[in-house]
UniProtKB/Swiss-Prot annotation:
Coiled coil: none annotated. Residues 278-355 form the PUA domain. It comes from Ruegeria sp. (strain TM1040) (Silicibacter sp.). Pfam families: AA_kinase, PUA. Its main location: cytoplasm. This is Glutamate 5-kinase. ATP binds at residues 13, 173-174.
Length: 368
C-alpha cells in the first residue's frame, strides 16, 4: 500500500469479468463509474494513470449474440472488432465528467519484441500522458492470434508498466490475491499478503483461474509479477469486483503485493547497458558535458556516425577522445543520423522532409 501512496505513475489492469456481467454480457456501468472516480482521484493527487483493459471480446460477444463458450479464432476476432468500439466509448463516457480525456491505444505483445515498435508505442504513451490524457490500452484482438488463444493481458499490462516506467501495477481481477493453492479446490489454501521474491516454490504454487470470461489465470499473473518487479515496479493482485476497487485496495482490502526489485529507471538503464551495440556515435566536448549533466543527445553535438543501424537499435556513445561515455537507443536510422549530425534540431524537418524528434538519443533511453 505504501508503494501506491508514493507512486508517481500507476498502471491498472481491468479483467473482462469485472467489466462485463457474466449472465447478460452487458457492461457493468455502475462499477465502471466507480472506477472512474478512483482514476480521477489518483489524477488529482498528481499521479499518471494508464489503464490496460480486457473486455472487447466479451462485449462484442454479447452484441453479436455469440455463446459464452470458447469461440473459434475468427469469431473471437469479429467479437473484438465490435467490442473495441463499445469499450472505448464506455471509458470515454465514464471519465469525461471528471474532465479527463481518454485515448485508445491498441497493441500486441509483438510491439514489445521489436525495438522500433517498442519506441513508437513508448513515445505515443509518453506524449499522451504528458498531455494529461489517460491511455486505455487494449490488446489488438482483431489481428492477434496467440494473445486471444492464451489470454495474456496480464503480461501485456506488465509490459506496458515496464514501457512507461511505472512505479505500481495493479491487476484488478476476480481473485483477491496469490494463494498457496487454488482456493476453489483447497480449503486450506492461504493467501499471501506480500511476496518479497518470486522463488521456485512460489512458482510451483501457481494454479489457474475459474472464471468463464477472463482467460488469464494465476500463472500469467505470476509471469506479469516477474516482469514488472524485475523492472522496479511493485505489483498488486486485488479482487476488483467491489465498487471503487482502487480505493478499497488503499483501504486495506485483501490483496497480494509483489515487492519491486529496485528502481524502474535504474532497471531500465541496466537493460540498455547490457545490450549489444549496433553502431557508434562520437560526440563533441559540449555534447559530452551535456550528457553528464543529464541531457539528451542532440544532433548538433554529433561529430561522427559509424555502423548500419535502425531506429531503436543500441549505439555506443564515444567522447571526442574516443573514450566510451555510455550507450543508448537511437531515434533515427544510420542514414538519417549521418544526415543530421552537426545540425540543429530546428533543421531536422528541412533535412529529412518530416518533423522528427529533437533528440538523436533521449536521456531516458541512455545509460552512461
Amino acid at each position: 500500500m505504501a508503494a501506491l501512496s508514493t507512486a508517481r505513475r500507476v498502471v491498472i489492469k481491468i479483467g473482462s469479468a469485472l467489466l462485463v456481467d457474466r449472465t447478460s454480457s452487458a457492461l457493468r456501468q455502475e462499477w465502471l463509474l466507480s472506477l472512474a472516480e478512483d482514476v480521477a482521484r489518483l489524477k488529482k493527487q498528481g499521479k499518471d494513470v494508464i489503464l490496460v483493459s480486457s473486455g472487447s471480446i466479451a462485449l462484442g460477444r454479447g452484441a453479436l449474440g455469440l455463446p459464452r463458450k470458447d469461440l473459434p479464432l475468427e469469431q473471437s476476432q469479429a467479437a473484438a472488432a465490435v467490442g473495441q468500439i463499445r469499450l472505448a466509448r464506455a471509458y470515454e463516457e465514464a471519465l469525461a465528467p471528471h474532465g479527463i480525456t481518454t485515448a485508445q491505444v491498441l497493441v500486441t505483445l509483438e510491439d514489445s519484441e521489436n525495438r522500433r515498435r517498442y519506441l513508437n508505442s513508448r513515445a505515443t504513451l509518453e506524449t499522451l500522458i504528458g498531455l494529461g490524457a489517460v491511455p486505455i490500452v487494449n490488446e489488438n484482438d482483431t489481428i492477434a492470434t496467440d494473445e486471444i488463444r492464451y489470454g495474456d493481458n496480464d503480461r501485456l499490462a506488465a509490459q506496458v508498466a515496464v514501457t512507461v516506467g511505472a512505479d505500481v501495477l495493479i491487476l484488478l481481477s476476480d481473485v483477491d490475491g496469490f494463494y498457496s493453492a487454488n482456493p476453489a479446490l483447497d480449503p486450506d489454501a492461504k493467501r499471501f499478503d506480500r511476496i518479497e521474491q518470486i522463488t521456485p516454490e512460489i512458482e510451483a504454487m501457481a494454479g489457474d483461474g475459474v472464471s468463464g470470461l477472463s482467460k488469464g489465470g494465476m500463472i500469467t499473473k505470476l509471469l506479469a509479477a516477474k516482469m514488472a518487479t524485475a523492472a522496479g515496479c511493485a505489483m498488486a493482485i486485488s479482487e476488483g469486483s467491489v465498487m471503487s476497487p482502487v480505493s478499497a485496495l488503499e483501504a486495506g482490502a485483501a490483496s497480494t503485493w509483489f515487492t519491486a526489485q529496485g528502481d524502474p529507471q535504474v532497471a531500465r538503464k541496466r537493460w540498455i547497458a547490457a545490450m549489444k551495440t549496433r553502431g557508434v556515435i562520437t560526440v563533441d566536448e559540449g555534447a559530452a558535458k551535456a550528457l553528464h549533466n543529464g541531457n539528451s543527445l542532440l544532433p548538433a553535438g554529433v561529430r561522427h556516425v559509424e555502423g548500419d543501424f535502425g531506429r531503436g537499435d543500441p549505439l555506443a556513445i564515444l567522447g571526442p577522445d574516443g573514450r566510451k561515455l555510455g550507450q543508448g537507443l537511437s531515434r533515427y536510422t544510420a542514414e538519417e543520423a549521418r544526415a543530421l549530425q552537426g545540425h540543429r534540431s530546428d533543421e531536422i524537418e528541412a533535412i529529412l522532409g518530416y518533423a522528427g524528434r529533437a533528440a538523436l538519443i533521449h536521456r531516458d533511453d541512455m545509460a552512461l
